[in-house]
């Protein structure tokens, strides 16, 4: 059974305060060990997000030493500068590929940052850019520029841009179970056109393509799942998904027939509603306004908490019965499609675990969940998050060293731990790893 430490619980309370609209200060902050909270924030790559929370606190509640406060502030300012640099890199790399005849889409990263109330508080990573084309064509093109780049099943390395690492994807993500992965790749092929054409502005710095929110609901869940199966995940990835869910309900605001009681199942329940019971009579989705959100100067700026990087169709001004019915219908249809995909991909129980975390850690209301929360799976995944941290870099259970043999032994050990919850993926992992070895030989330079 998972035991959450007192400081972790205080951290969760403060995280909800930092990201939420409520101004009520958590009473648990009186017992906060600010050094411990800072260490957890570093481990989970949430330093900037929590500093936004600190700025909301009255001075008497910030019971940390001046040195720690200045350190926290300095790191937060560095994140702002890093995000400006990543924005520029994402724009320039996208434009470079466009001039070479490739359409692109920026995955996660700076597209996710646009969904945050303060896009410059998110801890940035590298640039993951999905380049249109089959793997063989994209790999050949990249190696014509940089001959020694290593390729794996879904991406290939690329020369860094002004110190920013770049990964070129020909597949957005993958699953270890061959059957589920085949369905996932078909899904990506089916919806790719909308992703490459969904363009937004990054402040005033320039324009990029990012995925639609419907795509992100599927893609980013598979990304989180892949990290869980392979190395570990952190709260940053889960906070990204929190904002994806918020974004989904901003697109389809005031339009869901889902009631909170639908998702208040008994502990450990894995049952799910029949999507047909949620289906409306129409299939037309609400229209998106293409005019993107713009900051004033291309740098850190105040962004409306209701914005998600681009303007949305306003439902507020039209309360007519016809309008409400049409949008409710389209929202139900969109949710039905997401739920069907999750079942097809074998991700229903995992999604339920993530929804449990969305409620327990981030304070998301039941009406915004896309599947029923699953407490059993949620507690297991949350324990993995707290143990491993971002990308599993802080996992004390990594006991086999950093050699290639140690890495493979660690994978087997991880598979054994995960097989009880995710048997298809865990049992397929050694088979996929063997198949992937020969795939890499085929594409080895």
Locations of regions flagged by a protein language model:
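Conserved NTP-donor binding/palm subdomain of two-metal-ion nucleotidyltransferases/polymerases, i.e.
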Residues: 2-125, 130-253, 332-445
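Intrinsic disorder/low-complexity segments
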Residues: 201, 250-332
């Amino acid at each position: 059974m998972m035991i959450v430490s007192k400081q972790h619980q205080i951290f969760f309370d403060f995280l909800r305060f930092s990201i939420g609209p409520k101004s009520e200060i958590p009473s648990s902050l009186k017992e906060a060990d600010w050094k411990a909270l800072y260490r957890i924030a570093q481990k989970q790559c949430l330093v900037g997000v929590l500093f936004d929370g600190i700025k909301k606190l009255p001075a008497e509640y910030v019971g940390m030493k001046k040195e720690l406060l200045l350190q926290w502030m300095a790191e937060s300012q560095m994140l702002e500068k890093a995000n400006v640099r990543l924005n520029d890199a994402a724009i320039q790399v996208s434009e470079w590929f466009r001039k070479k005849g490739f359409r692109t889409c920026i995955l996660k990263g700076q597209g996710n940052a646009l969904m945050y109330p303060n896009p410059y508080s998110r801890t940035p990573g590298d640039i993951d850019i999905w380049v249109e084309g089959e793997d063989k064509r994209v790999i050949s093109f990249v190696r014509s520029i940089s001959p020694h780049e290593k390729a794996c099943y879904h991406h290939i390395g690329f020369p860094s841009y002004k110190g920013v690492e770049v990964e070129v994807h020909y597949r957005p993500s993958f699953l270890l179970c061959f059957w589920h992965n085949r369905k996932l790749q078909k899904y990506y092929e089916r919806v790719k056109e909308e992703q490459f054409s969904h363009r937004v502005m990054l402040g005033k710095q320039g324009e990029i393509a990012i995925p639609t929110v419907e795509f992100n609901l599927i893609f980013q869940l598979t990304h989180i799942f892949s990290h869980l199966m392979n190395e570990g995940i952190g709260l940053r990835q889960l906070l990204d998904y929190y904002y994806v869910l918020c974004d989904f309900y901003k697109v389809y605001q005031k339009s869901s027939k889902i009631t909170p009681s639908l998702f208040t199942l008994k502990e450990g329940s894995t049952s799910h509603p029949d999507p047909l019971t949620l289906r409306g009579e129409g299939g037309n989705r609400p229209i998106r306004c293409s005019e993107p959100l713009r900051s004033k100067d291309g740098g850190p700026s105040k962004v409306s908490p209701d914005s998600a990087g681009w303007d949305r169709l306003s439902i507020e001004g039209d309360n007519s019965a016809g309008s409400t019915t049409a949008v409710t219908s389209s929202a139900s249809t969109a949710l039905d499609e997401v739920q069907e995909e999750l079942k097809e991909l074998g991700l229903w129980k995992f999604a339920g675990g993530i929804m449990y975390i969305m409620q327990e850690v981030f304070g998301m209301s039941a009406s915004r969940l896309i599947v029923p929360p699953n407490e059993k799976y949620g507690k297991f995944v949350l324990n993995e998050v707290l143990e491993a941290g971002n990308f599993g870099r802080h996992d004390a259970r990594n006991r086999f060293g950093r050699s290639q043999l140690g890495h493979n032994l660690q994978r087997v050990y991880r598979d054994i731990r995960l097989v009880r919850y995710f048997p298809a993926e865990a049992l397929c992992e050694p088979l996929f790893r063997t198949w992937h070895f020969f795939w890499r030989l085929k594409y080895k330079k």
